[in-house]
Amino acid sequence: MGMRKYSWALILAAALCAAPAVASDLPTKKAPEEIVAPALPSGWQFEITGYGWGTWLSGQAGVGPFPSSPFYLSLVKLLEHFQGSAMGAFVARNDTFIGGVDVILARLGGGTNVEDPTSALYGSHANLTLTEAIVTAFGGLRIPIGPPNLQLYGTVGARGFHLHTALDLTSPVPGFAPTFTLTKDWVDPVAGLAAHYIVNEKWFVNFLTDFGGLDNSATGQALGSVGYNWTSSIATTVGFRALYTYERQVDGPLRDFRYQSWMYGPFAGFKYSW
């Protein structure tokens, strides 16, 4: 009996000594990974873009009892009469809201000599200038559809127009230098969509469209562009834009103003954001 008890004691001691070694060979349970809180939205993002838009212009216009006359100006022809422009946009957005303003200022001009000897203005020089301003302001809410790298907003706003035409005549007759001017201003409400799609850290796509108007006016535009982020703050974009305008103002039988136009062509922009 003494030997049997001694043998069992040795077996038990050996088992206790071997248990840690066996346990060290078993796979150990990993410690739970630290849960990292998702990054919160960075708040408002602001963008300022300066751009140049090379446009073709077509449409028709008329004043008073005279019939409307069609017109078409290619980009080359517009550049021949180009006297200056300024174009830019400002946009502020976050995960819920968007707001912005777009400004287009342009001036065209040209002159000619009246060489028809039967004209009462024979020998005069006529100089025509056209100044146009188009300002669009909008705001909107994000539409929660699509992948997380798509920001799609429904927008409402207004687009204001200013047209100023001046005709200056220089006559060989002393003291005779008449000037004729026509100025028209109007504002149209608009509604549409604005989208910003992030392809990756470098590339992105922008799209914007809207349409609106009142009883005697209408306007609409579509814009698409591809952009490249050179740094976290600086990007460049290239794209295509089309803008439609229609306006009629009747202030009397001799003051019937009619204007309809399409402006369309490529553009390139430089954007700074923060």
What are these regions (language model features)?
Residues 22-102, 265, 269-273:
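Short glycine/proline- and aromatic-enriched beta-strand/turn motifs that initiate or cap beta-hairpins
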Residues 36-44, 144-151, 200-202, 232-233:
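Short loop/turn motifs that connect adjacent beta-strands in outer-membrane beta-barrel proteins
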Residues 203-217:
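Transmembrane beta-strand segments that form the barrel wall of outer-membrane beta-barrel proteins
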Residues 48, 88-94, 137-141, 156-158, ...:
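Residues on the lipid-exposed face of transmembrane beta-strands in outer-membrane beta-barrel proteins
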Residues 56-83, 103-134, 161-186, 213-214, ...:
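Extracellular/periplasm-exposed beta-strand and loop segments of Gram-negative cell-envelope proteins
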Residues 1-10:
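Bacterial N-terminal signal peptides that target proteins for export
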Residues 186-192, 217-225, 235-237, 261-267:
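Transmembrane beta-barrel architecture of outer membranes
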Residues 9-18:
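Bacterial N-terminal signal peptides
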